[in-house]
Amino acid sequence: MYTTYKEYLKQETSLPFEEAMQIWNQIAERGKADAACRELIDRFLKCAVDYVRIRNGWNQKSLAEKGQADAERTRCHNLVISAKNKLSVYMYEHKLGNDWDDWLGEERKRIGDFACYVVLLQGLEAR
């Protein structure tokens, strides 16, 4: 467990907040005029919220609780990755640009962290 953001950033697969926001801004800006793309963005957001809901309380769970929740956490993480991949393919095929996906990469932890940042931003926007 990391006690500070600085400690988190020392990890090989860390994703700095600023980088995550640059990626998210590219997705949002490029996809806003395309209804089908907005639906894929909304799907990603729903999957991200479901995943983050489980992940947020992970460090407070007992070992037994983690064992019970692990399959669901993995399932939700897989759905986040799938939604991200579908969004990327759509944006590529419709010439909206998906260079953000190369920047984000395919590392599971990094994609999960991206989902956490996006959910944080959504929470701030909801105030």
Where are these regions (language model features)?
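Short, charge/polar-rich alpha-helical segments
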Residues: 24-49
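Charged, low-complexity interaction regions
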Residues: 31-37, 57-70, 93-98
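Short, charged, amphipathic alpha-helical segments
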Residues: 41-42, 64-82, 100-105
